[in-house]
Amino acid sequence: MAEARRIRESHWGDVVTYSRKVFVPLTNMCRDTCGYCTFVKHPTSPEANIQTPEQVLATAKRGEAKGCKELLFSLGEKPEERYDAAKAALARLGYSRMTDYLADMCALVLRETTLLPHVNAGTLAEDEIERLRPVAASMGMMLETISRRLNKRGQAHFACPDKTPIQRLRTLERTGQRQVPFTTGLLIGIGETWEERVDALVAINEVHLRHGHIQEVIIQNFQTKPGIAMENHPEPSLEDMLRTIAAARIILSPEISLQAPPNLSERHIDYLQAGINDWGGISPVTIDFINPQHEWPEIRQLAASSEEAGFRLQERLTIYPRFLRHRDTFLDAGLHASLANMARQDGLARSQCLETSPCNSELPTSTAAEL
């Protein structure tokens, strides 16, 4: 792990970041049936829904009032292509394709709030990326694994058309060709081998070397949940997670941010020592809808853990500073003004919400590393 720490510190210095976000689950219907998922609801469930524009905007306004800068749209993949009920629900909103509705909700958020949309819509075709790029500051999709074995019967991704590795890799390539700032990552402990983890990290890095668009990689640990198909599947150990984080830091280009969810483990200092430099999105308003049994940590708690490990917590935007410096390449021109107003000189958030000072206080740029 010493080499992972050296790489992290040489490129990211003593700063560890987080993004203050609000989470909007635009729809919890999905055509995939992953064995570890508790987010997705069948259209016959009374809990199945597509959020209305009014609901989206109400959540966005609550987040804006709490100092959030990012709005994360997360949604199931293409439910309208599998379920008539999902197709009908979308039609009642005036749409035939979920991606088009998502794009209009991003535009609504940009028009009515100061929040920047980050879109996590799964696999995307070329025209879907083109539709979303002008209204999404960044996009994301977990690669999760490169293992085709896990698509077989009895495995985590059986009967999941969007979870075949080739489809995930094609989305990474397509977003790279269109210069979209992109988040991806691995889900650890769903049946993959160590070699398959390494292969997945290498595949992510290769597409980044071609296009330079991967802004962060998440190393996320599988968590069992009541009622899922993998309820009795073992969770990865702390040692397994730390080895994977360190391997990721060594394999990936140093400029790629490395993140691990802070609400899925309390061993924050261990994660920092293994090589991460970012805590991801944390919401003061909404729960983690993907892992609802795990509460977000308090920002002051993360700040204290970071300080104990020798780091200074800073708030970032959904776009990392490197992409802001090359905004003409990576960002639609319509987003430039909003980002300029929200970012300070070093590219981090102008208004720092660290729970130790008012959210509207701007810290001097000299207190943050040039990332």
Regions found by a protein language model. Give the residues of each.
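Auxiliary Fe-S-binding modules of radical SAM enzymes
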Residues: M1-A2, R6, H11, L57, ...
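Active-site phosphate/pyrophosphate- and oxyanion-stabilizing loops and adjacent acidic/basic residues
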Residues: R5-R6, V24, A107, E130, ...
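Canonical Radical SAM [4Fe-4S] cluster-binding loop centered on the CxxxCxxC motif
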Residues: S10, V16-A58, K78-P79
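Hydrophobic faces of well-ordered beta-strands that scaffold small-molecule active sites
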Residues: V16-V22, L71-F73, P117-V119, M139-M141, ...
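Active-site-proximal loop/turn and secondary-structure-junction residues that shape catalytic pockets
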Residues: V22-V24, E77-P79, A121-A125, T145-S147, ...
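Conserved Radical SAM active-site core
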Residues: K41-L209, L371
